[in-house]
Amino acid sequence: MFKKLFLFLFISSLAASVSAQLKSKAQSFFSPRYTFQIPGGDMSDRFGLNSSLGLTFATKKENGTYFGVNGNYQFGSDVQEAGLIQNLLSVNNEIISVEGKPASVLIQQRGFNFSVDFGKFMRFTNSKNESGILFTIGTGFIQHNIRFEHQLDDIPQLDGEYEKGYDRLSNGLMLSQNIGWLFFSKKRFGDFYLGLELIEGITSSRREYNFDTLTSDLGDTRLDLLFGIKAGWVVPFYKKNLYD
């Protein structure tokens, strides 16, 4: 579903902008960004809706050629992994601390990814600003795991090496496709990016054994999908060159 939607948006925007392309001006910039992400594939069996914060360093040439590098930190609080820590729960579905009392455990999603992107910037003919549609594809690395936080309680079952038996650490190659609107204003601090992103992570579990389910999925291939809505502030390095 995500791939069909992304392909439709990509083709529609391409058809609308090819005839409206102007020569662009070269520009390098960095961009802090936020992405709201909807999981798909194997990722949706483990996590729900989540977010990422990232930073992009990029350059676009006069012919519209785009090159960028990205790093993103992923986080979320909707963990849906089946059987997670089931062996640690009491008959009342509580985890008991070393003090013999019910403990408070915050279960969260954590992860990161980084990639190298290539693409094309197409400027609009009717735009008085240096703005247009940006298409990119990229490749890189993605990793995610489950994090257990229990600062107020002592739970040795979820500390150190024991935690590795529950955290479902997975990582591997990622591919990405992006389509968005890159806008450079004549006004200072008025530049931004809005877009859609599809990430395909071809990952594998890196833990030998899951203590809670008494199973091993070490080396099993996963297809982790993330469909994202991305927004970012764009900071050019030499903005005065855009409108000389």
Place the predicted regions along the sequence by residue.
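Short loop/turn motifs that connect adjacent beta-strands in outer-membrane beta-barrel proteins
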Residues: Q21-Q27, N63-G64, F124-G132, F184-F192, ...
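Extracellular/periplasm-exposed beta-strand and loop segments of Gram-negative cell-envelope proteins
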Residues: G41-R46, D78-G111, H144-G172, T203-D212, ...
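Sequence/structural signature of outer-membrane beta-barrel proteins
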Residues: T35-G41, G76-D78, F121-T125, H144, ...
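Sec-dependent N-terminal signal peptides
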Residues: K4-L14
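Short glycine/proline- and aromatic-enriched beta-strand/turn motifs that initiate or cap beta-hairpins
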Residues: A20-N70, Q74, G232, P236, ...
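N-terminal signal peptide c-region/cleavage motif recognized by signal peptidases
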Residues: A15-S19
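Predominantly the C-terminal beta-signal and adjacent terminal strand-loop region
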Residues: Q177, F183-D244
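Residues on the lipid-exposed face of transmembrane beta-strands in outer-membrane beta-barrel proteins
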Residues: P32-Y34, L55-T59, G71-Y73, F114-K120, ...
